[in-house]
């Protein structure tokens, strides 16, 4: 197997969102946000459970009204994953969801009004062991910062974040994480770099409003990949105009590609050419769908010919190399006497993968 790259993780304090550690030496948590009406309890619960099934560590829910807060109470009772309540402007909503067992508050102290209101929320969070996420966004910078800098800049996002941090520091509250999101990759990356040097709190990564599935996934992979490779980031959310389930899958794929955290099978497959001896694309697509239930980390190479196939198989947990009517089979980097019939390759490969998972990791764990 390939050696794991060395990424020196930025030192940060550790907080807990429910039972999920964020920061310090904790695994980088992957989260998403519901896009249902929160007052539609049934739909919201169904979406949260779908996110849980694909590995979401944390789920954020928008709570814009008191009616939504009452719905949040019912939602919280029906799910297991930690929930973050996304709240703006009305501090009373924060107090209400705290009463209902929220695991984290996404709330900017500076936009909920007078000092006494801020103190009420912070005191409530402290009394109930609820962390706070300060979430700065390039699209909603304070007016004075827009006037000062003329446009969103890394320095403007940093100054906004530090304003909110200063409020919590003044109130002796240190259980918080911070994000400085932008839809522009370079703006977001440089803002996070500045913030990483300025504070010790955990950082929540994201390229906000990244776009539809394809463009948003690419933007997020580029931006977050740059930061993660530098050791910056303690939790992440991929923002897509798509099914939130896809956000979790893309998030894990980014971490998997950097070998930071793995979930499920990492398929290594050739783009195909006229040398392929079997339908590589169809095989990979079918296996990705069939094996979504597997969370044990594993590298599986599926190469259509003998040019690169043997080399990839040598560094894979399980590999197949295309041959005439029958394809070569590798296990833990060693070629096996057994060969696969190309006409039944998908079924045979699925059986071998499941057998290896059962032998290697009976509990099918995630790392």
Curated annotation (Swiss-Prot):
<comment type="function">
    <text>Converts 2C-methyl-D-erythritol 2,4-cyclodiphosphate (ME-2,4cPP) into 1-hydroxy-2-methyl-2-(E)-butenyl 4-diphosphate.</text>
</comment>
<dbReference type="GO" id="GO:0141197">
    <property type="term" value="F:4-hydroxy-3-methylbut-2-enyl-diphosphate synthase activity (flavodoxin)"/>
</dbReference>
<feature type="binding site">
    <location>
        <position position="312"/>
    </location>
    <ligand>
        <name>[4Fe-4S] cluster</name>
    </ligand>
</feature>
<dbReference type="InterPro" id="IPR016425">
    <property type="entry name" value="IspG_bac"/>
</dbReference>
<dbReference type="GO" id="GO:0016114">
    <property type="term" value="P:terpenoid biosynthetic process"/>
</dbReference>
<dbReference type="GO" id="GO:0046429">
    <property type="term" value="F:4-hydroxy-3-methylbut-2-en-1-yl diphosphate synthase activity (ferredoxin)"/>
</dbReference>
<feature type="binding site">
    <location>
        <position position="270"/>
    </location>
    <ligand>
        <name>[4Fe-4S] cluster</name>
    </ligand>
</feature>
<comment type="pathway">
    <text>Isoprenoid biosynthesis; isopentenyl diphosphate biosynthesis via DXP pathway; isopentenyl diphosphate from 1-deoxy-D-xylulose 5-phosphate: step 5/6.</text>
</comment>
<dbReference type="GO" id="GO:0005506">
    <property type="term" value="F:iron ion binding"/>
</dbReference>
<keyword id="KW-0004">4Fe-4S</keyword>
<keyword id="KW-0560">Oxidoreductase</keyword>
<dbReference type="Pfam" id="PF04551">
    <property type="entry name" value="GcpE"/>
</dbReference>
<keyword id="KW-0411">Iron-sulfur</keyword>
<feature type="binding site">
    <location>
        <position position="305"/>
    </location>
    <ligand>
        <name>[4Fe-4S] cluster</name>
    </ligand>
</feature>
<dbReference type="InterPro" id="IPR045854">
    <property type="entry name" value="NO2/SO3_Rdtase_4Fe4S_sf"/>
</dbReference>
<feature type="binding site">
    <location>
        <position position="273"/>
    </location>
    <ligand>
        <name>[4Fe-4S] cluster</name>
    </ligand>
</feature>
<keyword id="KW-0408">Iron</keyword>
<protein>
    <recommendedName>
        <fullName>4-hydroxy-3-methylbut-2-en-1-yl diphosphate synthase (flavodoxin)</fullName>
        <ecNumber>1.17.7.3</ecNumber>
    </recommendedName>
</protein>
<dbReference type="InterPro" id="IPR004588">
    <property type="entry name" value="IspG_bac-typ"/>
</dbReference>
<keyword id="KW-0479">Metal-binding</keyword>
<dbReference type="GO" id="GO:0051539">
    <property type="term" value="F:4 iron, 4 sulfur cluster binding"/>
</dbReference>
<keyword id="KW-0414">Isoprene biosynthesis</keyword>
<comment type="similarity">
    <text>Belongs to the IspG family.</text>
</comment>
<dbReference type="GO" id="GO:0019288">
    <property type="term" value="P:isopentenyl diphosphate biosynthetic process, methylerythritol 4-phosphate pathway"/>
</dbReference>
<dbReference type="InterPro" id="IPR011005">
    <property type="entry name" value="Dihydropteroate_synth-like_sf"/>
</dbReference>
């Amino acid at each position: 197997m390939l050696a794991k790259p060395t990424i020196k993780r930025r030192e940060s304090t550790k907080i807990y969102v429910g039972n999920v550690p964020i920061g310090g030496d904790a695994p980088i948590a992957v989260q998403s946000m519901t896009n249902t009406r929160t007052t539609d309890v049934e739909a919201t619960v169904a979406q949260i459970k779908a996110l849980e099934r694909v590995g979401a560590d944390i789920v954020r829910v928008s709570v814009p009204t008191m009616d939504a807060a009452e719905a949040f109470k019912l939602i919280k009772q029906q799910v297991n994953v930690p929930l973050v309540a996304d709240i703006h402007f009305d501090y009373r909503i924060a107090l209400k969801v705290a009463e209902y067992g929220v695991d984290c508050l996404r709330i900017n102290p500076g936009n909920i009004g007078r000092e006494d209101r801020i103190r009420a929320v912070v005191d409530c969070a402290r009394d109930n062991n609820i962390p706070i996420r300060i979430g700065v966004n390039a699209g909603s910078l304070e007016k004075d910062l827009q006037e000062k800098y003329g446009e969103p800049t890394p320095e403007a996002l940093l100054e906004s974040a530090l304003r909110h941090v200063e409020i919590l520091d003044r109130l002796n509250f240190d259980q918080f994480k911070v994000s400085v999101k932008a839809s522009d990759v370079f703006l977001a990356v440089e803002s996070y770099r500045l913030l990483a040097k300025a504070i010790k709190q955990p950082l929540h990564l994201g390229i906000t409003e990244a776009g539809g599935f394809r463009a948003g996934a690419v933007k997020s992979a580029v931006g977050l990949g740059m930061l993660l490779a530098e050791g910056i980031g303690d939790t992440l959310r991929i923002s897509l105009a798509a099914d939130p389930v896809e956000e979790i899958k893309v998030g894990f794929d980014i971490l998997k590609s950097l070998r930071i955290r793995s979930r499920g099978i990492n398929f290594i497959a050739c783009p195909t050419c006229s040398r392929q001896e079997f339908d590589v694309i169809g095989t990979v697509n079918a296996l990705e769908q069939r094996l979504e239930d597997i969370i044990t980390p594993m590298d599986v190479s599926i190469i259509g010919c003998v040019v690169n196939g043997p080399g990839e198989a040598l560094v894979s947990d399980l590999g197949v190399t295309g041959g005439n009517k029958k394809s070569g089979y590798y296990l833990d980097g060693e070629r096996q006497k057994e060969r696969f019939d190309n006409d039944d390759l998908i079924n045979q490969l699925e059986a071998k993968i499941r057998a290896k998972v059962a032998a290697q990791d009976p509990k099918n764990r995630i790392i």
